[in-house]
Amino acid sequence: MKRIVYLLLCVMVCGGCAKQKPHQFTNEVLNRMTPIKDQGDSETCWIYAMLATIETEHLRWGDSVNLSPYYIEKMMEQEPDAPESKRGEAATLLRLIEKYGIVGYDAMRSVDTPAPRFVFMLGAEYTPQEFARSLCRPGEYMQLMCDKDKPYYQEMELDMPDNWLHDRYLNIPMDSMIVKTERAVRAHHGVCWEDKEHGMAIVGIAHDENGKKYFIMKNSWGTDRPHGGLDYISFDAFRLHTVAVEMTKEAYGLP
């Protein structure tokens, strides 16, 4: 994504006018997460965001995993319909790990590293596909969107260029999306958030000195930033800019 566009959003969301005093945030919930990574100049935020969501979901159960975004970036080279920019949606990540699997971060710390053929974990050997199935079952996650001009509570394709695999999303009202997202985060589930230009994992909830609520989001631009690489996005901005969120069916409230 274009960082300058997103930075303008952050100014609007978190600071407003530069002369205003910075907000003082109080964290209400801050879920467990793996170390913040840096996507560099790539446009692969969707990979980092959805992998971070899966990691937080497993940390909820005490199962620590740290996954390699570079493995998926390399596997995209085998996809004939993948854009040269390597852009995508979080749902794209779910499709790709189902097909190609996933490996740990320590096994592949660069896109230039050869992709491992096996994953070694707790004395066991897995293929990347077997390892992925142990982390994310097919159909475990669901995609949510909000388009007020289309029927609610029906599945439909998200009409975005980055949805090049033509994944389908459940269309729900924005009020419901905010309620579902807040409830999932407070229950310590991983949730992935996307707007038109960027994607991040939602890892917490906070309020400012005026009681205004924010989602705490784990970014993928490194830690040399305010709040150590976390971003505070107000519920109002979430309402205005959200394109989609992903969470497990359990987090949504389905059996």
Predicted regions and their residues:
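C-terminal motif of bacterial Sec signal peptides marking the signal peptidase cleavage site
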Residues: 13-16
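Structured segments of extracytoplasmic/periplasmic soluble domains
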Residues: 48, 52-61, 96-103, 184
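Structural recognition of the beta-strand scaffold that forms the well-ordered cores
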Residues: 44-47, 70-74, 93-96, 104-106, ...
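Bacterial Sec signal peptide processing site at the extreme N-terminus
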Residues: 18-25
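Sec-dependent signal peptide recognition
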Residues: 2-7
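Papain-like cysteine protease catalytic cores
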Residues: 65-135
